[in-house]
Amino acid sequence: MNYFITFFFMHIAVLNFYFRFSNGNKIVMRVGGSPETKRLERSKRQALRMDNEPRWPRGTINYFFDEQRFDENSRATVLRAMEKISNHTCIKFSPKDARIKLRIVSDKGCQAAIGRVGGDQQYLSFPTSCYSVGSASELIHVIGFLHSHQRADRDEYLKLNLQPWRLNDWFQTMQYKKYLDQWWIVPYDYGSIMQYHDSDNEYGPKNSKYFRTMGSQIPSYFDYLMINEYYQCSCEGEEQINCKNRGYPNPGNCSECNCPLESSEEWKNITLNLDAGYMSLQNGTKLHQIDFVFRYLSISAPANKTIEVDIREITGVECNYGCYIGGIEVKTHEDRRMTSPRLCCKNDNEIYKSRNNPTIVMAFNSEGLDKYNIFYRFTD
């Protein structure tokens, strides 16, 4: 039996692990406790390492906007990114004066040092070209993490075809192998906000279904988890908190859980209408919203059935790398914490098959009105 569903809307959204990469030397970055920690159950993880102690003291980053060099059109974007990180981790951003501060300017390019690098002030460059909640990636650099394509295990997931000029760019091409004997935190997630898109045909995914997923502007479940493990964030008495879907108590609010799925309600034969509208800058320019709006569909099937999802109509959705304006994701990955392939281009559509029961469909948008016509059925 086919069920027909129509989605009207606009978009936003969210996550981690543990493995040791050893290449023979002394530099060790212990992250978030022992290898037996409950949150870390698989074999591959994301690492970080740039200095002997790149963490910010007590997980607090005091900051200020340089009024002479900062573009006020970007203030709300930076503050929203700070809020999202603090809401899911124990990292706190404080405008209070302190001896060690993050100085935020709007110079050319989105630029950030990796972790706490020393001195009384540290720079974060955030011009309007970095506009959107994707600015969280720059703040995650500040917290202590590099890009996904700089992981030591990148060759297992990416097909590199670097341009000649890029080969001389040590920072873009270096791998963590340089730092040797590291502790890894999270598995490789194509949907991480730290993963570049492949617009220059340099970092192609070995799993081609993730081509549009790469370059996401949405912090993933594992993005937040790696921060929490690295800074050893936890909640007192967290064993008493019952988190579903392999979630864990949220250090940003210990009465809640950080879960890979935002919704568990069952929806059938329903129409969703949601308009994200536009953001107006001080000069009158209209842009997409800073953050995304989300809508979720939960599809439950009889026992031992496969759920097939066919997205037959897509209107109002912009086809681009990372689906950074909006798109839709059918959670087909067997590990529900991982990002599944995303869709924002009409020609990329396929029938998605899932053994997850329920299967969650996540739609996200940051500009205007989007529409999806969705069919689903159950098969043996």
From Swiss-Prot:
Coiled-coil residue spans: none
Disulfide bonds: 90-233, 110-130
Leader sequence residues: 1-24
Catalytic center residues: 138
PROSITE patterns noted in UniProt: ASTACIN
Swiss-Prot/TrEMBL GO biological process terms: molting cycle, collagen and cuticulin-based cuticle; proteolysis
Occurrences of domain Peptidase M12A (ranges): 46-234
Compartments, record wording: Secreted
Gene Ontology MF terms: metalloendopeptidase activity; zinc ion binding
Gene Ontology cellular-component annotations: extracellular region
Chief location category: secreted
InterPro entries: Astacin-like_dom, MetalloPept_cat_dom_sf, Metallopeptidase_nem, Peptidase_M12A, Peptidase_Metallo
Keywords: Disulfide bond, Glycoprotein, Secreted, Signal
UniProt keyword Glycoprotein present: yes
Residues bearing attached sugar chains per UniProt: 87, 253, 269, 283, 304
SUPFAM superfamilies documented for this protein: Metalloproteases ('zincins'), catalytic domain (SSF55486)
Keyword Oxidoreductase: no
Role this protein plays: May lack metalloprotease activity.
UniProt name for this protein: Zinc metalloproteinase-like protein nas-21
